[in-house]
């Protein structure tokens, strides 16, 4: 089925009968906007950079207990656990997983990626008029608060769903990937989060990953391949007084200087690469971008000799159709074309996926969206489907997954979310759960 098919055809009214409209009203009336704002701020004011999710995990666990749920801690590490709770159905309907991540993108000491790494906007949250401000609000505690409040409303309403509603607040969605001396357990992310939760029982018939898409539908995401590209200088380091100039960049005795030539070529290659590998499907458009995220060479306390080796660390996004070994070969060819002696190491590979059999969930989202907005959801812009999100984990294991939520990604510089959008999201998540979890489950 194509997106056009979904958009053009009449969406069947299944899951909720007309006589149950009063149930919908009962649930939505229980969504308290003030409570939602306070929960989002409480979550946003717990600093939780990747690897330090213990405090927020305890908060979510305690909040769910207070609301009458029976949460579980599912963790690869004792101090970094996922929180899972279930609003049980009667086993006749579809099970829906709601998913958001608790970790945030910036630790205070990360001054070499973000000059203002300790700034409050990355570690706290506050209200300004009709906006909630903060990195954590947008990614991903605001959407999480929305479905937590929706789940509370469903439980308090007394409605009995046919299928389970599974709530998953996870760690490690934002990748800290092991490389060089940076090794687990301190440097390990995605294996501890949604993947661990799913492989330890947090499964349903479909999954809605609540992250910012500006309320557009996305069921494809890019994968990623991380490469360490090392360039070598001369066999014998030269003391500064012995350096000869002029020398062509690629012939410099200093590997750092030689790397400048490769970076120039890599930037040109990246532009061509993203156009050559553009991937379009009903679930979205993947434009695989490339970024040089780190560089190492020499030591700052001893700079009196030329450097024999310099490495760059390159984030290459890949589509569901690509093989990372093909990308590695292209990078090796680039090093050769630069006339450099070097090596290319693939140190992370996480495949991207296009969701399959997503129609029941997609149609439920469309019904809810149309009920709230009076129109069908639009196609989400390409950046929303060109990044890593945990729908990849669900789609990999055969659980049809879609990303759908309020606001935009902080990756583009957005650090504010409208309160109105959060309240709308809570209403939408409640409607979607009522719909999906009241659909008859058919055995695969």
Show where each model-derived region lies.
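Short glycine-aspartate micro-motif
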Residues: 95-97, 132, 205-209, 228, ...
């Amino acid at each position: 089925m194509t997106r056009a098919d979904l958009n053009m055809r009449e969406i069947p009214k299944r899951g909720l009968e007309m006589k149950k409209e009063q149930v919908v009203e009962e649930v939505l009336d229980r969504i308290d906007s003030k409570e939602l704002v306070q929960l989002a701020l409480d979550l946003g004011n717990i600093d939780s950079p990747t690897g330090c999710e213990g405090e927020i995990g305890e908060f979510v666990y305690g909040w769910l207990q207070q609301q009458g749920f029976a949460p579980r801690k599912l963790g690869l590490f004792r101090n970094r656990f996922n929180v899972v709770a279930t609003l049980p159905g009667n086993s006749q309907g579809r099970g829906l997983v709601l998913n958001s991540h608790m970790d945030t993108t910036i630790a205070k000491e990360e001054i070499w990626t973000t000059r203002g790494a300790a700034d409050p906007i990355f570690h706290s949250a506050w209200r300004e008029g009709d906006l909630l401000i903060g990195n954590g609000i947008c990614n991903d505690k605001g959407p999480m608060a929305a479905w937590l409040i929706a789940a509370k409303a469903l439980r308090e309403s007394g409605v009995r769903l046919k299928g389970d509603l599974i709530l998953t607040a996870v760690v490690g969605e934002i990748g800290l990937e092991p490389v060089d001396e940076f090794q687990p357990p301190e440097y390990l992310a995605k294996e501890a989060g949604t993947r661990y939760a799913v492989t330890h029982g947090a499964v349903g018939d479909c999954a809605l990953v609540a992250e910012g898409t500006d309320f557009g539908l996305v069921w494809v995401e890019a994968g990623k391949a991380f490469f360490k590209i090392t360039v070598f200088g001369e066999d014998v380091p030269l003391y500064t007084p012995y350096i000869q100039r002029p020398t062509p960049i690629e012939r410099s005795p200093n590997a750092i200087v030689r790397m400048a030539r490769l970076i120039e070529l890599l930037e040109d290659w990246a532009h061509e690469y993203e156009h050559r590998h553009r991937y379009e499907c009903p679930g979205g458009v993947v434009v695989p971008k490339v970024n040089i995220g780190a560089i190492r060479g020499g030591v700052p306390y001893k700079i009196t000799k030329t450097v024999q080796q310099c490495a760059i660390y390159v984030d290459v996004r890949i589509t569901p159709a690509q093989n990372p070994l093909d990308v590695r070969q292209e990078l090796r060819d680039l090093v050769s074309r630069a006339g450099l002696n070097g090596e290319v190491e693939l140190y992370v590979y996480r495949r991207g996926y296009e969701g399959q059999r997503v129609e029941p969930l997609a149609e439920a989202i469309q019904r809810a969206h149309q009920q709230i907005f009076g129109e069908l959801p639009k196609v989400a812009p390409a950046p929303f489907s060109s990044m890593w999100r945990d729908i990849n984990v669900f789609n990999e294991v055969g659980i049809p997954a879609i990303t759908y939520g309020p606001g935009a990604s902080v990756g583009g510089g957005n650090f504010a979310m409208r309160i109105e959008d959060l309240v709308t999201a809570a209403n939408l998540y409640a409607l979607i759960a009522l719909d999906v979890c009241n659909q008859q489950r058919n055995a695969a």
